[in-house]
Amino acid sequence: MSGIRADGTGDVGLIIAVKRLSAAKTRLAPVFSAAARESVVLAMLMDTLTAAARVGDLRSITVITPDESAAAAATELGAEVLADPTRQGDPDPLNNAILTAEQVVSGSVPNIVVLQGDLPAMQTQELADAICAARAHQRSFVADRLGTGTAALCAFGSALDPQFGPDSSAQHRRSGAVELTGAWPGLRCDVDTPADLAAARSLGVGPATARVVAHHR
């Protein structure tokens, strides 16, 4: 058994794709230095992984990343780590990384959920409830709080067919994925901008994010 779940009793594999930290969250530049942004991104990943690890439906959690620091943090928390083989300059790096991870993870579980790694306010029960709702559909997704992006993509007995990128919510809908409508405010609150971070903090972020943000503000 791979990943964070110690007992491996679930039937879902979770995938989180993380880009190189030095290139992540540039829209947080108005409030954080480059070095601070890397720390914030890493902390958000740690809080996301920690919350996800308590979901009973998960058999494994896999992080695919080219970043050594992100890989080390994920490994320390018990996640399986895949080195992202996506070449620099690839026109669709995120979806290709997810497809690479899907090929590996689908060999051991019938169902896969892709989750954003920047959900510091996500509660374990929110993800558990979303996975429960997703079981009614072959492909489904959870839109972000603004309704334009995608916080999670779920595939039950089906290929993921990820459509992440600009307006990914609409892209996933057009591809046939069913939009899940639960409230799940923390699950929907991915952090790309200072406004997103403020929204996440108003919900309550995990301890790693709280410490790093307090240190750098």
Swiss-Prot record:
One of its GO terms (molecular function) is phospholactate guanylyltransferase activity. Pathway: Cofactor biosynthesis; coenzyme F420 biosynthesis. Guanylyltransferase that catalyzes the activation of phosphoenolpyruvate (PEP) as enolpyruvoyl-2-diphospho-5'-guanosine, via the condensation of PEP with GTP. It is involved in the biosynthesis of coenzyme F420, a hydride carrier cofactor. Keywords: GTP-binding, Nucleotide-binding, Nucleotidyltransferase, Transferase. Phosphoenolpyruvate binds at residues 150, 165, 168. Its EC number is 2.7.7.105. Belongs to the CofC family. It catalyses: phosphoenolpyruvate + GTP + H(+) = enolpyruvoyl-2-diphospho-5'-guanosine + diphosphate. SUPFAM superfamilies: Nucleotide-diphospho-sugar transferases. It is an enzyme of class 2 (transferase). This is Phosphoenolpyruvate guanylyltransferase. It comes from Mycobacterium ulcerans (strain Agy99). One of its GO terms (biological process) is F420-0 metabolic process. Disulfide bonds: none annotated. It comes from the Bacteria.
